[in-house]
Amino acid sequence: ADGDRRQPQARAVVSAGVAAVARAGLAACGASLPLVLAAVLLAGCGSTSKRGAYYQGDGPPDRIPADLAEAPDAVPRVEPLHPRANRPYTALGRSYTPLTADAPFRQKGAASWYGRQFHGNRTASGEIYDMFAMTAAHPTLPIPSYARVTNLRNGRSVIVRVNDRGPFKDGRIIDLSYGAAVRLGVAAAGTGEVEVERLTN
């Protein structure tokens, strides 16, 4: 739900680095380009103005399921790591090394969310983004993996499946699906302070 959100991949990951950079910079421009070209043109797309808590073209769906606030958590299970989405990559000049060891992980910071502009497009895992599913994007948690996200203001929590990369804006630590943001009570504000706890890879 913010302008660092990325151009969705047109196909399975060409490389984690190129995909992350392309998605990070071109979403607000409405571009639909091959990933390599998108990365080259990234520098020209940084001036889109905000409208509310998200950038022009993104936001909540026109129709919200009546029971979305009661949607069930993602169910953690052990899955093989994606062969390409867990490689080191660079996005917006910063290098990231995804975590691949099965080790505890906790992090506090701001959560944002992404919505209708990306609904139906591919994530870094190659899966189709469903804005109503309990999923999330994280810069370094394994893809796929599961995490409990807790709203530090109201105590609500949700279990999400990490299947995408981002956010790449300072202070943001996780990009939630719209459904997960509704569950946590941060959809209206656009962001909220949360704690992320890894559950399993």
Locate predicted features.
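Low-complexity, intrinsically disordered or signal/transmembrane-proximal segments
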Residues: 7-9
